[in-house]
């Protein structure tokens, strides 16, 4: 069995294989300030004839505010009020406006472990696959049903395995790797499949680097992006879950059936950039060098961790942000922000001319601050560059690694980080 088939077998209480339809028990459900209100409304519609309108298990639900925080409109403030009230009445854990982005906060707070089946009303919920869970995004209506029953229907997905070998070259990172994979298979290359990342390259990645890989599985259509839990996973979770011990069961068996297996050698991989207006429009940085930039957004659930921002800041050194360039830095969580603060990186970036914001989704969703105007060109370490994603539909967004963002911050144009 693949690890995904094992997780669905556990969740449904019976052995299953890819293609089977199952009613699965959910281990953890997450919603946030954008999709949460509709889920709450749907929950009360489902429960309208029930005298006791309580969720199935409040200990298995997390509500977090991260998209429009602090509230940037009256409507956002009303959504926050509604969700705070719901969380209090139901006894649900609510991470308020100061904690950070859901896909960073849940793992760092110990809510995720190998073998879990996790759903979130956000498309990048697949990020938790970095810790060996099967996690996937669902809509608000499905989330309402989960709130009420703790169960959800699934078709057990086929698995598309990416075998990656070789040592990543200097200043080439997991963001470059995942962009390369997406560029290779396309935005629908693994539609409704579990993307399983394996090989010596993947095993060498830190948890933050693995989070980047799993986070972007959805950008090639993946239902999940899963990485086998190992000693790296165990070390990370032991710091967050008291008494955690790694169960070797949660990995794919030898002889497991895959829909496809692709093999890659990354020894000569160069930095990658996704060009407007699709994530699979990927080119080596050498083909887009010199593209003038108006703004760089360093952050998001894809690359907003301490490790990411440190890479950018170290490349920048003591040099200032390029003239006429806006550099927005948004750490992914309060925990990551404090690590950066204590290490001196926040002060260093502010002195360089960067705008450092409190932990949140920031410009990534295009509905808050730091938006691009018509004709402006942005470089972001986030996960999507659709037309209008970070502001005007007449703007242009390129996606890159933190290293490429750091090099480009010095020059005001897309720059190969190996050249600075």
Curated annotation (Swiss-Prot):
Pathway: Amino-acid biosynthesis; L-leucine biosynthesis; L-leucine from 3-methyl-2-oxobutanoate: step 2/4. It catalyses: (2R,3S)-3-isopropylmalate = (2S)-2-isopropylmalate. Signal peptide: none annotated. The keyword Metal-binding applies. Its EC number is 4.2.1.33. Binds 1 [4Fe-4S] cluster per subunit. InterPro entries: Acnase/IPM_dHydase_lsu_aba_1/3 (IPR015931), Acoase/IPM_deHydtase_lsu_aba (IPR001030), Aconitase_4Fe-4S_BS (IPR018136), Aconitase_4Fe-4S_dom (IPR036008), HAcnase/IPMdehydase_lsu_prok (IPR011826), Homoacnase/IPMdehydase_lsu (IPR006251), IPM_dehydratase_rel_enz (IPR050067), IPMI_cat (IPR033941). One of its GO terms (biological process) is L-leucine biosynthetic process. It holds the Pfam family Aconitase. It is an enzyme of class 4 (lyase). GO terms for molecular function: 3-isopropylmalate dehydratase activity; 4 iron, 4 sulfur cluster binding; metal ion binding. Keywords: 4Fe-4S, Amino-acid biosynthesis, Branched-chain amino acid biosynthesis, Iron, Iron-sulfur, Leucine biosynthesis, Lyase, Metal-binding. [4Fe-4S] cluster binds at residues 301, 361, 364. Catalyzes the isomerization between 2-isopropylmalate and 3-isopropylmalate, via the formation of 2-isopropylmaleate. Heterodimer of LeuC and LeuD. This is Probable 3-isopropylmalate dehydratase large subunit. It comes from Methanosarcina mazei (strain ATCC BAA-159 / DSM 3647 / Goe1 / Go1 / JCM 11833 / OCM 88). The lineage of its organism: Archaea, Methanobacteriati, Methanobacteriota, Stenosarchaea group, Methanomicrobia. The gene is leuC.
